[in-house]
Amino acid sequence: MNRDMRVVRECFIDDHVRGLFQQNRLRGFADLWHLDAPWVEAPNERRKGTSGVFRYPLEAGDGAIQPVFVKRQRNHNTKTCRHPIRGIPTFLREYRYIRELQQAGIPVVDAWYYGQAVSAGVQHAILVTRALEGYVSLDQWFALDENGNDEGQVRAVLRSVVDAVKPIHARGIGHGSLYGKHIFVRTGAGATPRARPSTSA
């Protein structure tokens, strides 16, 4: 992080998560910004900025691993009524949506951290979400051979996707990136399929 970068917003979901991050030598924005891991989604260039995602394993005190997705962006903004010229980071909007939906009891990914910093007029943002264990993306699910031919299972999974997305839209929140890679499904022998969308803004 540049010396002139100033952290303007930083939120951990709770003290337990803050402690888990500190256990992994991630004290805040600067440490998260400088993490080095292979990209799950290579940085894309849109909105006159960049945005990318990587998976990172956090070590818990009991030796267990809790993977998270670290999403980083630079000058990747969206305009709002309150900020019509410079806009706000799209991750800030996504973080707010996640919190709103969770408070309404709607299952979405868990946002564990949001941070924002400014350097020479350029906005930087980080959003960390807990990886959903036991879930795969809808794209991955359809790529599995055993899922392609069972019409009943396909219908059940698609119904779970509709059931997961419907309450989001009912709250007036439009999902800006509703693709198979952003919808996570959990299925298993005899289990009712469940879907959880990410909330990419």
What feature does the model see in each segment?
Residues 177, 181-201:
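Catalytic activation segment of kinase domains across protein kinase-like and atypical kinase folds
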